[in-house]
Each structure stands twice: as C-alpha cells, then as structure tokens.
C-alpha cells in the first residue's frame, strides 16, 4: 500500500509533533516477543508501518510494513531512575528525585530529529523492569489514539483479536464536519464572553504564525540571558483524597449560587483550577493585573462521529464486521478558556473551576465541534499557530489530559516468555506522557497514578514552583474555612 493519504480534518499544528507514551513495566520482558508483536500489529494496522510525507501541505502519509524497533540493555535497577518518592503526603508535592528530562532520556534513544516512520517502539531492559516507549506521529493520532495502539499491542500479546483496520474517514474523501452527530440548536449562552469562534484562537497564515513564533524565540532569548526566569519541568503528585476534598468544598460553594448550582465539577476541573490559581500566586498589589492568561483545552471528538463513517456503511447502519473496524485519527479540537492574572489571583478556586467546566461543556457540544472541524477543513493547507494574548508567550497553559487512559490496567504478561512473573502480576507502574512539539514547556499533562491519585507533568519558573508549594493547604484555598 504505497499510495499517499491526507487527513483533511487534522489541524496542521500537529504536523511536526510526535506523541510518546513511556511505560515502566515491573518485569523483564522478552525483546523478541515485543519485536514480533510490533510486526504483527503493523501487518494488521498498516497505517502504523507507513511513513510521513512532508512535501505536501498538509502532510500526507503512506501505509506500509516498516518496523521501527530499537532496544538496549542496562545493568541497572528501576529504583535507580524511578524511585517511589511520593510517600504519604496529604497534599500536592513536587518530586525532588524525578527529573522529566532525565526520565525522557531513559525512554527516548536512537530517534532521528525528524523521523519519517509513523510508529516506533523503544525498549530498555533493566535488571528488574522494562521501559517500553511507544511513539506515534501526532498528525496521525492524538493521546486517545496512542492509547488505542498500546491497548491493541497488549491484546496481541495476550493472543486476543483486535479490530480490523480502516483508513481515517477524511483520508477517504469524507468531510468529518458533515458526519458529526448532534444538532446545532443546543448552544450555551455567553454572558461572560468566555467563548470564541475557532478562528480567534489561531494565528492563520505565514505572516501571523511567524510573528507568533518570533515572540516565542524572543522570550526564549530573554530567558537565556537571565532577564526572565527559566522554565523547569517537574512531576507533581496529588493524592486522590486531597483532590476529592477540594472538589467537595468547591461544589459546596457553588451550590449556594443560583447561576452555578446545577454545575457538577470534575476532578480535572479542580486540578486545572488549582494549578492555574497557585502558579499565579496571591495578588501582589492593590492594582488590577490585567495580564491575559490563556488556558487551552484539548477535546477528543471521535465519539461524536457517526459510526457510518467507519467504512462506507449502508443506511441501515454498520455491519457486525464494520462495528469491529478501527481507524486512527487526530480527532482533537483545541479551545481556549480566557482568564486574567487578576482573576486567577483573586477569584476562588470554585469560581475558576466553574468557568473551566462551563467552557468545556460549551466546547464539547456538537455545534462547537462542527465549527472547529469546518475551520480546520478550510485552513488545513495554511500554517496555524495558537494565539497567545500575553506579551510573554510562555504564560499560556495547554491541558493534555490522559486521565481517561488506563495504562496501569494494561497487561504485558504475554511478553515475559519463560521468565517468572512477579507475584503481583506484570503491570505498568509509571507512565511518562510527552508530545514533542514546536513550542515546548507549555503543556500541563494530567494522568492517574493507578492508586487513586494523580500525577501532573508541567514546567514552571522557580517563583511559580515556590508559590505552588505554599498555596496547597485547605486554609489557603478556602480562607473562610
């Protein structure tokens, strides 16, 4: 299958990005089995064996049988690089021993600066564990599709059947905007002016995009000179009980307000609101800091697509075989929730979480998704860069939530071969999310720790890290308690 395919509903912003899921598995796995199962997966889903064609706009891809697999063996233990240092903390705590840059280097090796293969696996075998890293071109799929690929890989390890392969609908000539289920009449009112059409969230064309990228380079230059604080990445652990306590208290506050009494906050809303509020700290003066803060949220809309798009189904609906058909697609819409520094400094965490929930509900509506997909279809040959209102582009925060992807439940026992499995089973003990993109250091990754809590990966300045450490007590979050 050497033909070139183009997804006309994928935002070209994803073209030059790669998404990686690095997994720590608590057993020594058999390299030959892992390699053979990658070959089998590619033979069944040939899009994973294809290459990226960068000469087209937007980028195209081919299907094929390329197997990009590299491995190495290190005479080290897993505790050397992944110490369990969360302890019994009752509130958020930043790791002092896990450095994301060092962790990335343990997963990512033998990777070209601009790899042409769509799918790659890197395996590092330790004395008592295995690091397995799955990488996929972001233009082909998002975080949800990445989890689908890893899940299918584990199904093959267990000798379970996986769905049949199909090309993405928009690579087969369909306009996804015409196949999103739901009407256009359920539109949330916008008294607060929170919601913007997609074209307001993006810099379109070479001139505007280049101007935005120039601002990023200038900001990076000031950091290099020491005129602005540098960003440092860390992992943060949030105990599940603490998240629930904050959520319950915030929900109690909202229930007393008529305009928000029917809104049910999610744990992700609370985590995002807490993060935004704490990194901006308390108000340093009596003045109004109007510095804009853009919070971008990525929404997976694949569930809104009509099932009939999965392979030319009849009007009677998909057949049993077509219901078992799988396609990979970057079905991600990106929307902005707008704040000011003053709001984040002075509004309650419940108010901030409410605004995030309200915006998310609005942007998840089929009408909003349709507008976004139509915008992408219209501009898929243009250069797009997210809009950042502040003069410092590193003030923007983009949320990449992995909390719905249960990597901890994946079973790698089919890859241990003749070795003895650990008493507690062959399981994933740590997940390292990463999307290598043109602008790094702006993403807030959230995922579950497998024990009821949450892990955040993000970058902050030294001042922001200090503020985060000081602002996590219930007394500071809810002063009236």
UniProtKB/Swiss-Prot annotation:
Knockout consequences: Does not affect the biosynthesis of penifulvin A.
Active-site residues per Swiss-Prot or TrEMBL entry: 164, 411
Entry keywords, A to Z: Acyltransferase, Transferase
Gene Ontology MF: a single term: acyltransferase activity
InterPro entries (UniProt xref): CAT-like_dom_sf
EC number of the protein: 2.3.1.-
UniProt entry tagged with the keyword Transferase: yes
Function: Acetyltransferase; part of the gene cluster that mediates the biosynthesis of penifulvin A, a potent insecticidal sesquiterpene that features a [5.5.5.6]dioxafenestrane ring. The first step of the pathway is performed by the sesquiterpene cyclase peniA that generates the angular triquinane scaffold silphinene via cyclization of the linear farnesyl pyrophosphate (FPP). The cytochrome P450 monooxygenase peniB and the flavin-dependent monooxygenase peniC then catalyze a series of oxidation reactions to transform silphinene into penifulvin A.
Quaternary structure and partners: Monomer.
Family stated for the protein in its record: Belongs to the plant acyltransferase family.
Name this polypeptide is given: Acetyltransferase peniE
Organism in which the protein naturally occurs: Penicillium patulum
Gene name of the record: peniE
């Amino acid at each position: 299958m050497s033909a070139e395919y183009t997804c006309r509903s994928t935002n070209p912003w994803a073209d030059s990005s790669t998404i990686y899921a690095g997994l720590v598995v608590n057993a020594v796995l058999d390299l030959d089995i892992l390699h053979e199962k990658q070959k089998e997966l590619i033979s069944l889903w040939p899009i994973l064996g294809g290459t990226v064609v960068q000469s087209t706009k937007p980028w195209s891809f081919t299907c094929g049988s390329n197997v990009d697999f590299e491995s190495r063996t290190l005479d080290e233990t897993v505790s050397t690089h992944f110490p369990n240092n969360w302890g019994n903390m009752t509130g958020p705590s930043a790791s002092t021993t896990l450095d994301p840059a060092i962790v990335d280097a343990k997963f990512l090796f033998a990777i070209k600066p601009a790899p042409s293969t769509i799918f790659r696996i890197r395996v590092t075998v330790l004395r008592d564990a295995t690091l397995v890293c799955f990488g996929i071109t972001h233009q082909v799929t998002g975080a949800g599709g990445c989890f689908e690929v890893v899940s299918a890989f584990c199904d093959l390890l267990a000798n379970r059947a996986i769905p049949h392969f199909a090309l993405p609908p928009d690579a087969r000539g369909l306009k996804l905007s015409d196949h999103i289920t739901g009407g256009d009449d359920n539109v949330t009112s916008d008294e607060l002016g929170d919601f913007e059409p997609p074209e307001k969230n993006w810099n379109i064309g070479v001139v505007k995009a280049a101007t935005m990228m120039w601002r990023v380079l200038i900001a990076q230059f000031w950091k290099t000179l020491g005129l602005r604080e540098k960003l440092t990445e860390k992992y943060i652990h949030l105990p599940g009980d603490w998240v629930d306590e904050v959520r319950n208290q915030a929900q109690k506050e909202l229930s007393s307000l008529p305009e928000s009494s029917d809104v049910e906050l999610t744990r992700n809303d609370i985590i995002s609101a807490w993060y935004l509020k704490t990194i901006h700290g308390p108000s340093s003066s009596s003045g109004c800091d109007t510095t804009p803060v853009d919070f971008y949220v990525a929404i997976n809309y694949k569930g809104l697509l009509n099932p009939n798009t999965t392979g030319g189904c009849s009007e009677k609906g998909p057949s049993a075989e077509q219901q078992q058909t799988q396609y990979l697609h970057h079905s991600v819409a990106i929307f902005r929730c707008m704040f000011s520094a003053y709001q984040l400094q002075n509004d309650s965490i419940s108010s901030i979480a409410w605004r995030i929930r309200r915006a998310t509900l609005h942007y998840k509506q089929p009408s909003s998704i349709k507008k976004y997909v139509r915008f992408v279809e219209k501009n898929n040959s243009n250069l797009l860069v997210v809009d950042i209102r502040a003069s410092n582009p590193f003030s923007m925060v983009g949320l990449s939530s992995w909390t719905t992807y249960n990597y901890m439940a994946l079973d790698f026992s089919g890859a241990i071969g003749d070795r003895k499995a650990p008493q507690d089973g062959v399981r994933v003990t740590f997940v390292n999310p990463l999307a290598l993109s043109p602008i790094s250091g702006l993403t807030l990754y959230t995922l579950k720790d497998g024990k009821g809590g949450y892990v955040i990966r993000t970058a902050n300045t030294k001042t922001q890290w200090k503020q985060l450490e000081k602002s996590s007590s219930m007394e500071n979050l809810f002063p009236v308690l």
